[in-house]
Design a protein with these regions (language model features):
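Alpha-helical transmembrane segments of multi-pass membrane proteins
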Residues: 1-319
Length: 319
């Protein structure tokens, strides 16, 4: 709301100036990039909401999960922007690059969740053991585990999203009003992020769950990419076809990835059966049944972390 209000106030104060006719033709693609990058901002922060909930089971607490996701997210944005900033003025097909970056970020974000498995825990344990073997503290070893999870799930998509920022600036910023145009790009992207966070946190995740929400975000990202290469001018045929291919793979992956993918990776689920699983605004709750016959017991997971169970030791401890 603050970003929208500031933008409205700035527009009210802007005086109309005489503009040559040729600027009228150039304005349409600029506004298109502005709106597309605004929607991309919603998708990007929607990813952060999903990641903050889905990565918890590979860490110990939600506080650590949020901090690590945010740090990795910002690092990816920084590196992506820095890597492409020096080359963006030499791009001959900025619309094609923009479309591929946004669509590719959506596909990779979904692919990384779809490919999650036992390998991530093994990689975390191996990295922690290596750090401890060097004489590091247990805190550093635990931090290494968290970093491996964040790099495996969050890092690559955010690098692509960060790289899209200088391309969006090139498409949206004119030479006559650099400050105003840059402000518009940041304001619209921020506004899109606000809407994306609210929709994902309060509507999509409770309604669709984490995996399906991530799939929908990937499809929206593919739609942004397709719109960019379809409506933008000077797009190379190969990049247009590449965005279409990325979109088709994203749709297929969104439909084929199991809804309980994250639940199946809970530590207790590997040696038991999933009795209950629900995702909502506050987090995820799962009940896993382990053991057989009279020795069967149930374990409660909140946000992917085992909290208690109905085995005798747990009943005595949690009484």
């Amino acid at each position: 709301l603050a970003a929208a209000g500031a933008l409205w106030f700035q527009r009210q104060r802007s005086l109309p100036v005489e503009t040559p006719a040729r600027h009228h033709a150039d304005k349409a693609p600029d506004r298109l990039a502005l709106w597309l990058y605004s929607i991309a901002g919603g998708v990007a922060l929607g990813y952060e909401v999903v990641w903050s909930q889905s990565i918890v089971q590979f860490m110990s607490t939600r506080t650590y999960a949020f901090a690590v996701v945010l740090a990795t997210y910002l690092t990816g944005l920084f590196l992506g922007s820095a890597l492409l900033a020096r080359r963006v003025d030499r791009l001959r097909d900025p619309w094609g690059v923009f479309g591929l970056l946004i669509a590719g970020a959506g596909l990779i974000a979904l692919l990384e969740i779809a490919l999650l498995g036992r390998w991530l825990e093994l990689a975390q344990s191996a990295a922690e053991a290596w750090v401890l073997s060097l004489g590091a503290s247990e805190l550093l070893g635990m931090s290494t585990r968290f970093a491996v999870a964040a790099l495996s799930i969050v890092f690559v998509p955010t690098v692509l999203l960060g790289a899209a920022f200088p391309v969006a600036l090139r498409l949206s910023v004119g030479r006559d009003h650099v400050g105003r145009n840059v402000g518009e790009v940041v304001a619209f992207n921020t506004l899109g992020g606000i809407v994306g966070v609210m929709l994902c946190g309060f509507v999509l995740i409770p309604l669709l769950g984490l995996v399906r929400t991530l799939g929908l975000l990937a499809i929206i990202a593919a739609g942004i990419g397709y719109f960019a290469v379809r409506k933008g001018h000077g797009v190379k045929k190969g990049r247009r076809q590449g965005v279409i291919a990325v979109g088709l793979v994203s749709v297929a992956l969104a439909l084929l990835t199991p809804v309980d993918k994250l639940a199946s990776l809970l530590p207790g689920a590997r040696n038991g059966t999933l009795a209950f699983y629900e995702e909502g605004r506050g987090g995820t709750v799962a009940v896993v049944t382990q053991g057989k016959g009279q020795r069967a017991f149930q374990r409660l997971y909140i946000q992917g972390v085992s909290n208690t169970g109905d085995a005798m030791p747990s009943l005595r401890y949690m009484r």
